């Protein structure tokens, strides 16, 4: 099967990017090298093409009323011009996807529009799960992205760079805030969507725009010495920041409580949602495993599937692992038996038949200091 290509594919070729198959898309794993790209984001700014991700539009009168049942988080806890990170659950409380929902407000004829930014590998599952569990007359569900480009400008200088590009201030927009507006000097008739969000632990923006406007932003960024970045750096940045990767750290067999996402479950809101009974039971009885962070001694990397031991007892499994360019240390996430999931608990990680010392830590290995 032919791989899907981003509208910016020609820019990858110009930049000699190394390309890989990711969720059916031919995407750059790196441009100048993972470490260099990672450090560019941590020190100044980097630009990612994340057009492989899905964007679902949900329209209707009070659409939150209809889609609330898919999410354990109270959808009325955010309003127009804001975004909300949450998880979509199956009927057993397992995570179908983690995503961000944006409220674009009332557009026309009292119709409110919500945008759901979902993982590339889960777009079809998400779309069908919503569609199959809603009355078609209640609400409109469509693929919003179509031929558009989704870019992520990330790093401590990202806000200044974006303000220069749009020739306008964004200081009034809070974190997880968004706007959907026309910038005449960029694309006179095009509404550009952008939000103060990201997947790196730094300040950042995610921008949905036409191919023409995206090329404009790409070229502008390169002219300002912003590093084009690939999926490799995106993975190490998100791991340092303590952010989950769907299919590795979370899936339909893991619950929000197990994944350290219990703060997204608003049982006190009393709204019905898929999996509520299972999560009520977990809240009452506790969980058997918990996602934690690990520092691993030496330079060996604990990859997905590596066993975590306490003495000779198998107490867990690594889900994600990498060398941390910022910490200069091997780091990982692992699901650990709850009784052993204690901060500073010393464990062993089995890597290629050898045991390496590990120490359980909080899942966020890095936090920005500005």
From Swiss-Prot:
It holds the Pfam family GCV_T. It comes from the Bacteria. GO terms for molecular function: aminomethyltransferase activity; transaminase activity. One of its GO terms (cellular component) is cytosol. Its EC number is 2.1.2.10. Keywords: Aminotransferase, Transferase. InterPro entries: GCS_T (IPR006223), GCS_T_bac (IPR022903), GCST_C (IPR013977), GCV_T_N (IPR006222), GcvT/YgfZ/DmdA (IPR028896), GcvT/YgfZ_C (IPR029043), TrmE/GcvT_dom1 (IPR027266). Belongs to the GcvT family. The glycine cleavage system catalyzes the degradation of glycine. PANTHER family: AMINOMETHYLTRANSFERASE (PTHR43757), AMINOMETHYLTRANSFERASE, MITOCHONDRIAL (PTHR43757:SF2). This is Aminomethyltransferase. It comes from Prochlorococcus marinus (strain MIT 9301).
């Amino acid at each position: 099967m032919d791989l899907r290509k981003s509208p910016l594919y020609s820019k990858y070729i110009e930049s000699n990017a190394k390309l890989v198959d990711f969720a059916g898309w031919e995407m750059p794993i790196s441009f100048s090298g993972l470490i260099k790209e990672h450090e560019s984001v941590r020190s100044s700014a980097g630009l990612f093409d994340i057009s492989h991700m899905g964007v679902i539009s949900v329209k209707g009168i009070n659409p939150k009323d209809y889609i609330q049942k898919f999410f354990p988080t109270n959808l009325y806890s955010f309003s127009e011009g804001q975004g909300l990170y949450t998880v979509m659950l199956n009927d057993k409380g397992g995570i179908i996807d983690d995503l961000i929902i944006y409220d674009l407000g009332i557009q026309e004829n009292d119709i409110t529009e919500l945008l759901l930014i979902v993982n590339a590998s889960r777009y079809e599952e998400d779309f069908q799960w919503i569609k199959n569990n809603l009355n078609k007359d209640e609400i409109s569900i469509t693929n919003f992205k179509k031929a558009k480009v989704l870019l992520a400008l990330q790093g401590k200088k990202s806000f200044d760079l974006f303000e220069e590009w749009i020739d306008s201030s964004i200081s009034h927009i809070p974190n997880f805030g968004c706007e959907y507006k026309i910038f005449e000097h960029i694309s006179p008739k095009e509404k550009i969507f952008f939000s103060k969000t990201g997947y790196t632990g730094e300040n950042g923006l995610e921008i949905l725009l036409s191919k023409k406007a995206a090329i404009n932003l790409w070229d502008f960024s390169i002219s300002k010495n912003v590093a084009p970045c690939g999926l490799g750096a995106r993975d190490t940045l998100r791991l340092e920041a303590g952010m989950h990767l769907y299919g590795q750290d979370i899936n339909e067999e893991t619950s929000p409580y197990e994944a350290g996402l219990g703060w997204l479950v608003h049982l006190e809101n009393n709204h019905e949602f898929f999996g509520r009974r299972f999560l009520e039971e977990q809240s009452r009885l506790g969980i058997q495993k918990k996602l934690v962070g690990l520092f691993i001694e030496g330079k060996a990397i604990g990859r997905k599937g590596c066993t975590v031991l306490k003495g000779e007892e198998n107490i867990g499994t690594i889900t994600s692992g990498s060398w941390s360019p910022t910490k200069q240390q091997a780091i990982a996430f692992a699901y650990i038996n709850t009784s052993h999931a204690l901060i500073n608990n010393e464990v062993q990680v089995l890597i290629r038949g050898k045991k390496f010392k590990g120490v359980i830590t909080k899942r966020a290995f890095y936090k920005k200091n500005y």
